[in-house]
């Protein structure tokens, strides 16, 4: 069964359904060039505090692994900004959302206080998947519609 109506338009989503999808794919070389050009200022502009600490730890152990970490976080932020429909404009900014890891290793989005009120008024849960290979990094984000006050989808 198709999700496209006879008129060709996608029907509106019900509360609790998908409200937004974002995807970003980038060449890791792009991040390497930005780091070479701007140094740590680039990472400090993009990463939140917990991400930045993890970036430095990974880069100390293996510089290439640090770059891949930064690339996946960059991609996740781009994908998230697309899923919420803002791009990189207020109240969205690079450091206001972090991709951290749950105890089992699953990536989770942590939305900073500066963005949380805006996000919580409009959306439900957000989900992220990230990956990297030798030359590419990618992230995919799905944002759920905010559930109805009575909890119905």
UniProtKB/Swiss-Prot annotation:
Main location: cytoplasm
EC number per UniProt: 2.7.8.7
Cofactor: Mg(2+)
Transferase found in the keyword field: yes
GO molecular function: holo-[acyl-carrier-protein] synthase activity; magnesium ion binding
Record localization: Cytoplasm
Keywords: Cytoplasm, Fatty acid biosynthesis, Fatty acid metabolism, Lipid biosynthesis, Lipid metabolism, Magnesium, Metal-binding, Transferase
Binding of Mg(2+), residues: 24, 78
InterPro entries to which the protein is assigned, alphabetical: 4-PPantetheinyl_Trfase_dom, 4-PPantetheinyl_Trfase_dom_sf, ACPS, Ppantetheine-prot_Trfase_dom
Reaction equation(s) it catalyzes: apo-[ACP] + CoA = holo-[ACP] + adenosine 3',5'-bisphosphate + H(+)
Classification via Pfam families: ACPS
The keyword Lipid metabolism belongs to this UniProt entry's keyword annotation: yes
Protein origin, superkingdom: Bacteria
Protein name as it appears in the record: Holo-[acyl-carrier-protein] synthase
Originating organism: Bordetella bronchiseptica (strain ATCC BAA-588 / NCTC 13252 / RB50)
């Amino acid at each position: 069964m198709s999700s496209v109506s006879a008129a060709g338009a996608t029907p509106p989503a019900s509360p609790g359904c998908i409200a937004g999808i974002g995807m970003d794919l980038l060449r890791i070389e792009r991040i390497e060039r930005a780091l070479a050009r701007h140094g740590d200022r680039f990472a400090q502009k993009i990463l939140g505090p917990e991400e930045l600490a993890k970036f430095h730890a990974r880069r100390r152990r293996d510089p290439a692994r640090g770059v891949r970490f930064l690339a996946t976080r960059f991609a996740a932020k781009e994908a998230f900004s697309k899923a919420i429909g803002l791009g990189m404009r207020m109240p969205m900014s690079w450091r206001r959302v972090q991709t951290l890891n749950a105890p089992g290793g699953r990536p989770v989005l942590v939305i900073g206080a500066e963005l949380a009120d805006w996000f919580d008024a409009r959306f439900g849960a957000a989900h992220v998947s990230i990956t990297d290979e030798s030359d590419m990094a990618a992230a995919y984000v799905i944002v759920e519609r905010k559930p109805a006050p009575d909890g119905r989808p």
